[in-house]
């Protein structure tokens, strides 16, 4: 099963997958709660927003005066996965901006600690060759080991990630 939002997805998902369309973090959370108990592997590629509007206006906002917007944190979906299915093999992604390799790896290891991920794919999206929407990337695959994947096509990286997952399960 694939739970997806069309907001930022430009990849064609093969028809062998059951696609569940969602628009909000809440909808994704609800769909995942139904799916996770019956799955063996969960690859959490979604970049779910960390914040949402605290209040929604139901009327037109007056543009003649200053405006303050209050945000509140959204639920961290990935942190619920192991609670729903302790035996699932959980793969997370960690995108960072303008930080060192050591800090990216530390951030990935923190996700392993916080969410119970078995494997984290980490990268720096501020790199001009590896930004969101780019066809290429360079990543670190992190668990007890660290595999550095140099600049490669995203398809090549996906194959490497799947090879690592298959070695681990």
PLM features: residue spans?
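Short, small-residue-biased leader/transition segments that mark boundaries at the very start
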Residues: 1-4
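Flexible loop/turn segments at secondary-structure boundaries
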Residues: 12, 99-100, 129
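Contiguous, function-dense segments enriched for cysteine-driven chemistry
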Residues: 6-10, 30-33
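Glycine-rich phosphate/adenylate-binding loop
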Residues: 87, 104-169
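Glycine-rich phosphate-binding loop
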Residues: 22-93, 98-125
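Structural signal for short hydrophobic segments within the conserved structured cores
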Residues: 18-20, 147
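Short loop/helix-cap segments at secondary-structure boundaries that form the rim of catalytic
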Residues: 10-17
């Amino acid at each position: 099963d694939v739970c997806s939002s069309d907001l930022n997805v430009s990849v064609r998902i093969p028809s062998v997958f059951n696609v569940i369309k969602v628009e909000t973090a809440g909808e994704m959370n609800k769909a995942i709660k139904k799916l996770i108990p019956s799955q063996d592997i969960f690859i959490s590629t979604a970049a779910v927003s960390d914040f949402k509007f605290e209040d929604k206006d139901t009327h037109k906002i007056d543009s003649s005066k200053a405006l303050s917007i209050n945000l509140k944190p959204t639920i961290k979906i990935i942190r619920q996965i192991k609670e729903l299915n302790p035996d699932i093999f959980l793969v997370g992604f960690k995108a960072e901006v303008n930080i060192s390799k050591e800090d990216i790896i530390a951030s990935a290891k923190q996700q392993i600690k916080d969410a119970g991920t078995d494997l984290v794919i980490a990268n720096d999206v501020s790199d001009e060759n590896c930004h969101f929407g780019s066809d290429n990337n360079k990543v670190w695959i992190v668990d007890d080991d660290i595999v550095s994947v140099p600049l490669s096509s995203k398809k090549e990286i996906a194959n490497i990630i799947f090879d690592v997952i298959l070695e681990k399960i």
